[in-house]
């Protein structure tokens, strides 16, 4: 009988401790502010999505904390990622939306990297970010085939070497032999759009959803200022049915299998989307609260109505899905990494 009483007492005590811990974790966020860093400058799609999510996320977190968005551009997003990994307190109050292709910097051994990609805490992503490469219509070459023999290569913008905006044009060079002059150092999509308007650049890659659904590109399309050349997804985006995928282009040009594998590694960053990540060692209970809140926020009728009004498409990834992808993508054979180094490091 004593053993039974002891067992019951233990279970009751365990349940009480668990209940207190649960209550404590839910009370933690009350009266506090969560800082959401953006690894890009203001005015681009990454910044817009961060501010969009921030409007709705807080009310689905117990305690209804404020969500404060702060831009931290630099080194193509590495600055923000390094900060989150090494400096931000792992207390559940600091997170960020960062460039999903930063894993490529780690794979090729970039000296600037001070993080281990799979060890971040992963909360979720509101959309996948397959890209479309678009160019000003006043550029003389009208097609990819014509660009092969262009008298002057087009100038194409990107924030840095780690990112689909850089990967897609460079993969065209690798697969088709098209020469493209990359212009790096832009803080985000807003700066690149302004440079395109001024004629500083001819082309850039951006997300397919932003290209058809956001300004200024939505108006540019209507006015015939730009045209789409190729998109990065495995399938054609429904709103760009006449624009070939890069995979279709590779098949049509009988691209070698080694180049196809390189393309798959680089373009898969689109599956990570616009990941919300946090510092390693963030308490698991707080991570789960934030993951649950993200899922609830993404189904909030007010958010869905706002997204529809903006003509934005949601394509969610859970924190668990992002975590699995992040771990998988870091396991690459030496020959792929060497090809990546050649593509991303050689000028």
Predicted regions and their residues:
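Short beta-strand-to-loop elements that line the ligand-binding cleft
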Residues: 66-74, 157-159, 180-188, 206-207, ...
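Short helix-initiation/N-cap motifs at beta->coil->alpha
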Residues: 72-80, 183-198, 209-213, 320
């Amino acid at each position: 009988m004593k053993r039974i009483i002891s067992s019951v007492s233990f279970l009751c005590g365990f349940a009480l401790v668990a209940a207190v811990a649960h209550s404590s974790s839910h009370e933690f966020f009350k009266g506090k502010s969560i800082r959401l860093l953006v690894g890009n400058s203001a005015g681009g799609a990454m910044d817009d999505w961060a501010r969009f999510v921030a409007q709705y996320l807080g009310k689905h977190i117990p305690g209804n904390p404020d969500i404060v968005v702060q831009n931290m551009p630099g080194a193509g997003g590495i600055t923000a990622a390094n900060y989150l990994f090494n400096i931000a307190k792992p207390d559940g109050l600091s997170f960020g939306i960062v460039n999903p292709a930063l894993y490529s910097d780690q794979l090729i051994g970039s000296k600037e990297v001070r993080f281990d990609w799979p060890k971040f805490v992963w909360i979720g992503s509101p959309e996948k970010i397959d890209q479309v490469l678009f160019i000003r219509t006043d550029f003389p070459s009208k097609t990819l085939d014509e660009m092969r023999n262009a008298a002057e290569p087009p100038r194409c913008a990107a924030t840095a070497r780690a990112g689909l905006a850089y990967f897609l044009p460079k993969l065209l060079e690798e697969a088709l032999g098209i020469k493209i002059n990359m212009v790096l150092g832009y803080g985000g999509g807003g700066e690149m759009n302004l440079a395109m308007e001024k004629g500083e650049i001819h082309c850039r890659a951006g997300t397919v959803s932003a290209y058809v659904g956001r300004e200024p590109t939505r108006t540019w399309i209507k006015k015939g200022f730009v045209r789409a050349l190729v998109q990065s997804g495995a399938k054609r985006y429904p709103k760009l049915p006449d624009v070939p995928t890069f995979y279709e282009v590779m098949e049509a040009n009988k691209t070698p299998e080694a180049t196809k594998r390189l393309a798959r590694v680089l373009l898969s960053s689109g599956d990570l989307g616009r990941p919300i990540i946090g510092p390693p060692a963030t308490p698991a209970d707080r991570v789960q609260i934030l993951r649950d809140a993200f899922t609830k926020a993404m189904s909030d009728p007010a958010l869905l109505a706002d997204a529809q009004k903006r003509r934005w498409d949601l394509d969610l990834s859970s924190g668990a899905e992002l975590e699995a992808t992040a771990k998988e993508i870091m396991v690459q054979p030496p020959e792929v990494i060497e090809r990546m180094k050649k593509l991303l490091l050689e000028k």
